[in-house]
């Protein structure tokens, strides 16, 4: 049985934490930023923990 390949696009966008959760980054922070408040843009810079239902699908793309 061949080894499962890692989805390279997902590997660049998501990381696994030490506890096994999936860490990602917020959307809506690349353009059209003039109408967004400074507080909102500041919070979008931070990473976030992906929701469990999405993390299940992402973890299939990142087997190793």
UniProtKB/Swiss-Prot annotation:
Pfam families: Ribosomal_L35p. One of its GO terms (molecular function) is structural constituent of ribosome. Belongs to the bacterial ribosomal protein bL35 family. This is Large ribosomal subunit protein bL35. It comes from the Bacteria. InterPro entries: Ribosomal_bL35, Ribosomal_bL35-like, Ribosomal_bL35_CS, Ribosomal_bL35_sf. GO terms for cellular component: cytosolic large ribosomal subunit. GO terms for biological process: translation. It comes from Desulforamulus reducens (strain ATCC BAA-1160 / DSM 100696 / MI-1) (Desulfotomaculum reducens). Keywords: Ribonucleoprotein, Ribosomal protein.
């Amino acid at each position: 049985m061949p080894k499962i390949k890692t989805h390279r696009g997902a590997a660049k966008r998501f990381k696994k934490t030490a506890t096994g959760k999936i860490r990602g980054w917020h959307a809506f922070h690349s353009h059209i930023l003039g109408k967004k408040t400074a507080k909102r843009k500041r919070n979008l810079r931070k990473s976030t923990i992906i929701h469990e239902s999405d993390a299940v699908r992402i973890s299939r793309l990142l087997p190793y």
